[in-house]
Amino acid sequence: VLSGSDKTNVKGVFGKIGGHAEEYGAETLERMFATYPQTKTYFPHFDLQHGSAQVKAHGKKVAAALVEAANHIDDIAGALSKLSDLHAQKLRVDPVNFKLLGQCFLVVVAIHHPSVLTPEVHASLDKFLCAVGNVLTAKYR
């Protein structure tokens, strides 16, 4: 459960990310594919090279979902309901991949905004990303 300070911290991070969300989304995916090559299996039709238009486009979707969740932090489940249905019923993505993506997003934020990612903010952002992952996997059951 996200506390009031967690919510403030998450909104602060997304405020700092600002117009870079799409770029960070693509960078997160590239990092995930490089670090966890097994995640590539869900994208057999993608050009997974650095700077690929397909990775950028999907990164934009990832970023949009995270921004949507942050903007509706009191109702993440409602904000991501359709995306949860898609991943559970059609795409059938292994739930562990959401954790891997979250870890990679934390690294990207740390690279670009090291001073923002204090231990408290890091913990809040991690809790938020876990909450997003839980919402996206809730309909698997």
Curated annotation (Swiss-Prot):
Tissue specificity field: Red blood cells.
Annotated CDD domains: Hb-alpha-like (cd08927)
Positions bound to heme b: H87
The UniProt record lists the keyword NADP: no
Alphabetic keyword roster: Heme, Iron, Metal-binding, Oxygen transport, Transport
InterPro entries in alphabetical order: Globin (IPR000971), Globin-like_sf (IPR009050), Globin/Proto (IPR012292), Hemoglobin_a-typ (IPR002338), Hemoglobin_oxygen_transport (IPR050056), Hemoglobin_pi (IPR002339)
Gene3D superfamilies, per the entry: Globins (1.10.490.10)
Taxonomic superkingdom: Eukaryota
GO molecular function: haptoglobin binding; heme binding; iron ion binding; organic acid binding; oxygen binding; oxygen carrier activity; peroxidase activity
A cellular-component GO term for this protein: haptoglobin-hemoglobin complex
GO process annotations (BP): hydrogen peroxide catabolic process
Binding site for O2: H58
Residue span, Globin domain: 1-141
Function recorded in the entry: Involved in oxygen transport from the lung to the various peripheral tissues.
The protein's assembly and partners: Heterotetramer of two alpha chains and two beta chains.
Family statement drawn from the similarity comment of this UniProt entry: Belongs to the globin family.
PANTHER family: HEMOGLOBIN FAMILY MEMBER, HEMOGLOBIN SUBUNIT ALPHA
Protein name (database record): Hemoglobin subunit alpha-A
Protein species of origin: Chroicocephalus ridibundus (Black-headed gull)
Gene label: HBAA
